[in-house]
């Protein structure tokens, strides 16, 4: 079996990745790493792993040595050296942080305050949105797993951009996420009394996912795309809903737009275009690798409205990373990801 290592296993994304991979029939999770909990058994940190695994957190160096595929679930700036070591040893590295999502070092420094530490390997990375880059992913050993907000927005807009149907300078992306998107670290904003029974935007006009969204949408459109992106925190654990507003180049018919989306995504296992009249909801994608898209039209403003929903921990992080791994290893893309949302 393919041996898997997770570096950053005790954060929310790393723990979710472990939970999913333990049920994958074709891989073995062989090693875990955590700086904060080195030497501790993972089931002492997350009790849901009791009797499921007795893996002990060790050094990142040892994980790379032992494993065939390495997942890095680390804060920005910490994955490049590990990825370089993995590539030098002919391993696959799937990074779930931000280190490889932007192609421009200048943009990365502007938004993240750091330069690339291993600039020579950035040209080897592929942006891991399977529905966009599947063929490139098949041939790649270094994957930049997309951010959670960008995943909803990019899947929501791709059919329109690929067919040059909308204007590129007035796209509004209004997104709401559960608090797991902020990570496991303690912050005032995610402290229960601060987040419970309220709803508010954050990092307005300054969220680090903005350049990732614009770069990927621009590649789809083969032209510069500008977005107004505003994220909000919902008082729930998991899930994202993005409401996207865009202006068509010409008069559009909602039935024709729906037909376009249905045809575009007909072979995509994890993207579901809802029937006209339905509205996408977090409830129906929770705990799955699915993206649900619903399409609407504001007739008064001649505006297309797309609602795109995912589970931020799965299709927005760990599940999409496994989907990328499956593609690279030649497995069925849905291996280990045949998940159905609970009805309640």
UniProtKB/Swiss-Prot annotation:
Q: Which InterPro entries match?
A: AGPR_AS, AGPR_type-1, NAD(P)-bd_dom_sf, NAGSA_dehydrogenase, Semialdehyde_DH_NAD-bd
Keyword Ribosomal protein present in the record's keywords: the answer is: no
Q: What GO MF terms are annotated?
A: N-acetyl-gamma-glutamyl-phosphate reductase activity; NAD binding; NADP+ binding
The record's active-site residues are 148
Q: Which UniProt keywords apply?
A: Amino-acid biosynthesis, Arginine biosynthesis, Cytoplasm, NADP, Oxidoreductase
Which Pfam family is one of those matched by this entry?
Semialdhyde_dh
Which pathway does it serve?
Amino-acid biosynthesis; L-arginine biosynthesis; N(2)-acetyl-L-ornithine from L-glutamate: step 3/4
Could you tell me where this protein is found in the cell? Cytoplasm
The catalytic activity, as recorded, is:
N-acetyl-L-glutamate 5-semialdehyde + phosphate + NADP(+) = N-acetyl-L-glutamyl 5-phosphate + NADPH + H(+)
Q: Which GO terms describe its cellular component?
A: cytoplasm
GO process annotations (BP): L-arginine biosynthetic process
Q: What is its EC number?
A: 1.2.1.38
Task performed by this protein:
Catalyzes the NADPH-dependent reduction of N-acetyl-5-glutamyl phosphate to yield N-acetyl-L-glutamate 5-semialdehyde.
Q: By its UniProt entry, which HAMAP family does this protein fall under?
A: ArgC_type1
Family, per entry:
Belongs to the NAGSA dehydrogenase family. Type 1 subfamily.
Protein name stated in the entry: N-acetyl-gamma-glutamyl-phosphate reductase
Q: What is the species listed in this Swiss-Prot or TrEMBL entry?
A: Clostridium beijerinckii (strain ATCC 51743 / NCIMB 8052)
Which lineage ranks, top first, belong to the organism behind this chain? Bacteria, Bacillati, Bacillota, Clostridia, Eubacteriales
């Amino acid at each position: 079996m393919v041996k898997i290592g997770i570096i950053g296993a005790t954060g929310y994304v790393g723990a979710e990745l472990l939970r999913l991979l333990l049920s994958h029939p074709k891989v073995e999770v062989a090693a875990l790493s955590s700086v904060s909990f080195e030497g501790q058994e993972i089931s002492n940190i997350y009790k849901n792993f009791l009797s499921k695994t007795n893996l002990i957190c060790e050094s990142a160096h040892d994980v790379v040595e032992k494993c065939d595929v390495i997942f890095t679930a680390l804060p920005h700036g910490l994955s490049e050296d590990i990825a370089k070591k993995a590539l030098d040893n002919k391993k696959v590295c799937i990074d779930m942080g931000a280190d490889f999502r932007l192609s421009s070092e200048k943009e990365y420094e502007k938004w993240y305050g750091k330069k690339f530490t291993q600039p020579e390997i950035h040209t080897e990375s592929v942006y891991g949105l399977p529905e966009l880059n599947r063929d490139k992913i098949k041939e790649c050993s270094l994957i930049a797993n997309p951010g959670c907000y960008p995943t909803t927005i990019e899947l929501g807009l791709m059919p329109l951009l690929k067919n040059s149907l909308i204007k590129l300078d007035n796209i509004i992306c209004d997104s709401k996420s559960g608090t797991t998107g902020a990570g496991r670290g303690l912050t005032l904003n995610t402290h229960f009394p601060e987040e419970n029974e309220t709803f508010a935007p954050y990092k307005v006009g300054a969220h680090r996912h903005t350049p990732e969204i614009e770069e990927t949408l621009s590649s789809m459109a083969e032209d510069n795309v500008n977005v107004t992106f505003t994220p909000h925190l919902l008082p729930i654990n998991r899930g994202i809903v993005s409401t996207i507003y865009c202006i068509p180049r010409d008069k559009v018919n909602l039935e024709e737009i729906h037909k376009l989306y249905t045809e575009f995504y007909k072979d995509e296992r994890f993207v579901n275009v809802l029937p006209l009249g339905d509205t996408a909801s977090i409830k129906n994608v929770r705990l799955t690798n699915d993206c649900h898209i619903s399409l609407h039209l504001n007739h008064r403003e001649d505006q297309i409205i797309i609602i795109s929903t995912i589970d931020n921990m799965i299709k927005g992080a760990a599940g999409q990373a496994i989907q990328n791994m499956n593609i690279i290893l030649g497995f069925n893309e849905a291996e280990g990801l045949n998940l159905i949302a609970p009805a309640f």
